Structures are given as structure tokens and as C-alpha cells.
Amino acid sequence: MAVDGGVSQDCSRGQTPAYIDHTNAETLGQFIHDSYSIRPADFVVMDGLQGLQNGPASVWAGTNYASDKMNMRLILAGKNAVAVDTIEALVMKCDPKLVPHLTKLEADGFGTTDVSKITVVGKQVSDVAKPFVGKQTAICPGS
């Protein structure tokens, strides 16, 4: 499973060269880090109304779309995409410290994954968190 949030969506403005290997979390995380660090977002809004577990791309991998949908009914927003993605990961019961692009961006000063330094307004993570299932259970052990 991939944690696909505000940082990675900001990086998908163009097609990546086919010769770049993004088949595992580490190389994909490095690509997302490099792309995002060129021009970080000023503000990010994440549509979390309908989530999809068993990713990435569960629909194209032949799994059951109907059973993989996660009706979250959330909108996440903030001035720092790393913080927004950290909250997204926690909502999915994933450890943001194990998401490669988040740890790389945090190390380079683009944001924090330390939840004690992130202000959440509205519903709290504990009120809305649901375990997402997927292949990378080390990142999302709640699955």
C-alpha cells in the first residue's frame, strides 16, 4: 500500500520518464521527495471523501473495487503538505515515520511527521482512523 497524499499529488504534474524505477516504496519515495523539493506547495487540500485500500492501484491490479473503497468523508487541508500527509497516514493507521518520502522531506526541513507539532482542527485522528489493508504492512501495521 502507498500513502498517496498532498505531497505525491503535487508531484504528478507531468509524466515521469519510463526509465526511472518507481516499482518500490524507496525509489518512488525518492522521486516524490526530489519532485516536491523543487517547488513545495503553499497550501494543500486533500480529498479524503472516498479512500481506496489495497493500493497502489488496486483497481488495475484486479482486486475488487467495491470492497476496497473506504468511505472516509474527510477533507484534509493545510499550509504544509508533509504535515497533511502525516495526518493522512495516521488516519489510515499507517506510521508516517515509515513513509519514505515523508521521512526524506522531514530530514531536509520541508515539514514534520511529529504529530505533537501538528495542529488538527475539527475531528481528531482517533475519531476517524480506519485501518487500510495492503501489501506494505510494515508501513501500515494496523491493516
What spans do the regions from the language model cover?
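Extended, low-polarity segments enriched in aliphatic/aromatic residues
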Residues: 1-143
